């Protein structure tokens, strides 16, 4: 059984921590989509001695994807699925670079998957972490500095998906978004190991507190107050202004 992570990055400061963390819990391969980062993400990984055999980088190179990066059937059919098959990947976890799978009592990904099988899509709830009132994070990581989270799990989920079940047929409800991937009439489960009706629903309500569930996705949504303002607020303002005055294509 072989597992992989797919992640989109653009000037992610702490991609090395991300790779090392997921390698530690048993992820064997990474597909990284570099969305025109200022510094080539491959150069960052090489400088930090990350084994080049465990990842492949896809570059947007200014390409405009039909319906955007998340909804590009062409990207999945021509680049992502072939890479997954070439590397004999059985299960794919699609997350953002600030999201870390908390595996709880499971020793590694194999143990986790063995517990939940059979499934085609495992919907894992997100737990949001805050800023810890840190103005600027000068460390190389987010896991240690930011230890204050919400008390309740978010209803939103990310999915661990069986590669052979991924459906890229738009006529059958292809939904290549960062939350769920559509599967071929498959079995979808929640983190309580219960079968759920919808394979494409973006939310699953879990009533238990976060420390009473087997697994969750830790989302470090505010890596410090300065970065949050720059990336979440200023970037949106710039986009709105540039679109209004046609400053960008």
In which residue ranges do the predicted regions lie?
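Catalytic-site signature of metal-activated, phosphate-bearing donor transferases
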Residues: 69-74, 103-249
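Short beta-strand/loop segment that forms part of the nucleotide-sugar
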Residues: 28-36, 56-60
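The conserved acidic donor/metal-binding loop of glycosyltransferases
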Residues: 96-100
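Active-site-proximal specificity loops/subdomain of glycosyltransferases
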Residues: 42-94
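Short acidic/polar active-site loop segments enriched in Thr and Asp
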Residues: 28-29, 90, 120
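Structural recognition of the beta-strand scaffold that forms the well-ordered cores
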Residues: 4-7, 31-32, 54, 123
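N-proximal low-complexity "stem/linker" segments adjacent to membrane-targeting elements
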Residues: 1-23
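A generic secondary-structure signal
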Residues: 21, 78-83, 112-115
